[in-house]
Amino acid sequence: MNRTHLAFSKTGLALATLVMISACATQPPAPTEDRSVAEQVRAPAAEQTRGLQVYPLRNPAVTELSQAALAAEQAGDLDQAALLLERALRIQPRDPELLQHMAEIRLERGEWDQAENFAARSFDVGPRVGQICQRNWRTVALARERLQRYDEAANARERLQECQVEPPVRL
Amino acid sequence: MLRRLLIHTILFLFGLSLGAGLPWVWWLDREAERRFAERQWTQDSRIYARPLELYAGLELRLEALVVELERIGMRAGDPSRVGRFSQQGPRINLHAPAFRFPDQDQGAQRLRVTIRNGVVEALERSDGESLALIRLPAAELGDLLPAGSDDRTLTRLGDFPPLLVTGIQAVEDRQFRHHHGVDPRGLARAVWTNLRRGALVQGGSTITQQLVKNLFLTPDRSLIRKLNEAVMSISLERHFSKGEILEAYLNEVYLGQDGAQAIHGFGRASEHYFGLPVQALDVDQIALLIGMVRGASWYHPVRNPERALKRRDFVLGQFLNTGLIDAGQHDRLIARALDVATHRQRRQRPNAAFLELVARQLRRDYRDEDLRGTGLRVFTTLSPSAQLAAERGLARGLAERERQPNELQGAAILVEPSSGEIRALVGDRTASRRGFNRALDARRSVGSVIKPFVYLLALAQPDRYTLVSPITDGPIDVELPGQALWQPRNHDDISHGEVALMDALANSYNQATVALGLEVGLPALYRLLGQLGIEPGSEQHPSALLGAISLTPLQVAQLYQPLAAEGYSAPLRAITQVVDVDNREIGRYPMRLRPIREEGALALLDFALRQTVLDGTARRLPGLLDQDPGVRGKTGTTNDRRDAWFVGYTRQWLGVVWTGRDDNAPAGVTGSATALPIWAEIFRPLSHRPQPAQWPNALEWFWIDWPQARLASEDCQNALAVPFIQGSQPLELSDCFEPASTSRRSRGRRR
């Protein structure tokens, strides 16, 4: 592969000229509450528990926050769910489950690029196999489809297949 | 005849006063009603630190917890009282006051926190029940655009402590529940006293009258004003309930000054004098504040403590007389000393630089009139204990290392890399000074701090460059159209010949870096900086490869953030949430990520920046830390030692330190001798968890006969385990390579 230039993400934000703190302004409200989108990510993965699964150890504080986030999400309060997940991520910034949950919340809020980026981060630090891997790539695929990057979406669907790994044979 | 004249005169006067007086009374009545109904109180918009979240396993030093507690207004004392904490060995018993979070009203709670070896070991309620997570109240950092002369914390009647509500009546107006605005008996008593003394010395004012006076009238003591006051008081009582009047009174009454601002109401007074929300006040504290109603300056607990104490005890006596407290309580309470938080000088508190950052960001997103006096609450990312560490570290570090007192200035920033949240920001060695904010506004040459980005560009081409690629550090002539030949030199004026790429970075060789930079291309560097959110200007000169680019410390922090966050760029942010006076969210600044898709190259660079600390220009650093949790870093020094930089990071903290002179004259500073030790000073008190590096799967590790680009065996003399992007390792074998041993291993270092 000939890589003569850094292929930095072009999809990113063109950060403000006022670079002192290139913070994002207030989030515009999601166009639609696309609840079904997140369901598309979770349900198919949940059915396939046959392959190798990797469960990271959880800090009880993180468990409490992520359960509260789930409850808020189910109650339709996506803002609150996102806030709770941010608090949890301050405690465990590299928790793939939290990052993927955040990706799904962003998906439901219609923030496609953030959904993709959080899912990618979750994959990077995650087990890269099993359920969470499938949710990662499903999220990425859906987000890319919504962003009309169909080739890349197809690519993500291929990666999804690689998440299925047969468990090691136990003696 | 005379009698008729008298009667006529009296009738005439009566008619006149009726004719003129009735419209006057009617007008006053209307005015009082309208103005009371339409009154709008200003309340400053306040800025809060991030609330500290406590949980078992949190890395937190005991001293840092104490700092955090003090910043939320708590003090050492008996934790049975709200707002107090006590320490017994590794355990802190604390009684945290109530706090209104945007998403939750949290009551006061008694807790036990056990901290051993810098880690929270246990977190319990005082009854022993174990807790997974506790969010402490957020520390108030200061006000946003103070709304001018007044400040208050609006409090609903039902939220005041019942003792305050009844106590104020016992002292100021016992007939409040029964009168209709004026209390004739009280008035008669006052009139009698005044006549006897021949002057106006006593006011028999009811609470309603006092409120009318404060809200609508001038403070002069004339008979006309007294009449107006009486009419308007009766009017208020006709139109509004006792509860509404009392609530307004409790929020309006004048209770002293905070700098140029007047403190109105018990809510703010409680925060000002005791550092506590009014709900948390104890009986003696309530009595002190009630006593101040008569004369906030005369009975000021700090300026006139003896008078204040006497007055408080008088008020406690009134409480006893009216049965609000019993004799035992009374005797116990008057034995207590005055207990005000004299250290609480909000205006002089540090954080000036950070508050300015917050204000700038808010001004960009909101109109001034929406921010000023509207009682917004702004929740930020600042960590009070990290801020203190940064302020102290910078001040001490500069004082120790400058040639003459107060020659140097500096700036320091601490960021949590994965979220981009700014934890501390210092823009002046005297942190409380407002003025030139160097962290945000000092555009200074960055020097070698730019170099890692040149190397990142090279390492992203694994077919051309690896960490062990030989590059030439030698005299180099750069021809520029229409300009003199540019001949960069090394800091030590020595050319080092052929060197391994990683050594060129770790030792910050200029000539090697220019050679490499010209290969990868200047436009590529400018493109990369732009993608990382920095606009260094359009004019491209190769001296940019050596950092002849002026950036602010905050921009440098933004550049390094993705390096410290495993390649995920997150815009630096200081604000998380803004809520209005009714706790409705009006603004949110969520965490955002953007991947820099060069996982492998970033990991190689990370390894090289670790090598810089272990064996390069930053090798002094580990000796300055009690424990090195794997810091990566880069020094920077500019021409004639005008600027010194150090940027260092772990997965938990990214720190940027700049020092130099404000007039940009040679300052005798260097990155490794000035900025680096200051960075260490700041970093030492921070809590951190040692984290094993997690390398991406795309890397493979090989033993290298360092600095030759040859594979070696583990037991070769110069063997060093070096990561490579898959397939990019050298193929040549070292002389000491033994085919029997495997040259590949997962991790390690030997040299």
Positions of predicted regions on the chain:
Chain A
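Bacterial Sec signal peptide processing site at the extreme N-terminus
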Residues: L18-A45, L171
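Alpha-helical segment of the N-proximal tetratricopeptide repeat
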Residues: Y55-L83
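TPR alpha-solenoid repeat register
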Residues: L98, I132, N136, V169-R170
